[in-house]
Design a protein with these regions (language model features):
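Active-site core of glycosidic bond-cleaving carbohydrate-active enzymes
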Residues: 1-56, 60-207
Length: 207
């Protein structure tokens, strides 16, 4: 953690993270939007737990730190030219990359205000098929987090249509299992260890 800003830097390099979505993206000293936005989400959730336990001091500490991290991240990684977050700091020598995952994490983590939701949505999705405007949204890990956020925001009609379209494209008619890749045509294996056969149904029942 950078002591001055409170932002996380170099975590992938120092700890050897192997995220299927983000591994290898960042150079030394760069500020990952996704990681710091999820850090904000962690702090906000921690504040809720402390409030439940009536530990008001710790709750306020978590909220204050989340606000500090969010403000520092907006100052360094938010691009006012397109009203989207860059994957890394705008001060980086690399070209800006306003990808879906970085901006989703910013919305999910409370770094982007709710008033930005419509701009975020139409930057990466369509209201009618084809729904996806980015290949990143095809990743199952992203999909469940995205659905969780949409339901939490009170969205129902579009997410159900999107959910049905997404998983119908993954269904293998031979094995009745979910495909890991849209573009594969060989029989999909059923991996009970990963919950691949039931996870979409459990998610729908829960919501």
């Amino acid at each position: 953690i950078d002591e001055e800003t409170g932002l996380l830097t170099d975590a992938e390099i120092r700890f050897g993270f192997q995220s299927k979505i983000s591994f290898g993206e960042f150079k030394e000293g760069e500020i990952p939007t996704y990681l710091n936005a999820l850090f904000c989400r962690f702090l906000l959730s921690s504040a809720e737990i402390y409030r439940t336990l009536e530990d008001w001091e710790q709750a306020e500490h978590c909220l204050a730190l989340a606000g500090r991290v969010a403000a520092a991240l907006r100052d360094r990684n938010f691009d006012p030219a397109c009203s989207l977050f860059c994957r890394w700091s705008l001060e980086s020598e690399r070209m800006p990359d306003h990808n879906l995952f970085a901006n989703f994490c910013a919305m999910y983590g409370g770094v982007l205000p709710l008033s930005s939701f419509e701009h975020f949505f139409y930057s990466f999705f369509n209201y009618d098929p084809p729904y996806d405007r980015s290949d990143e949204s095809r990743h199952p890990y992203f999909h469940f987090l995205f659905m969780e956020m949409m339901f939490a925001l009170g969205q129902r009609e579009w997410p159900f249509r999107y959910f049905r379209d997404y998983w119908s494209k993954r269904m293998c008619s031979e094995s009745m299992a979910w495909r890991a890749d849209f573009n594969r045509d060989d029989p999909a294996p059923t991996k009970f260890s990963e919950g691949s056969g039931v996870s979409p149904n459990i998610f729908l029942l829960r919501e």
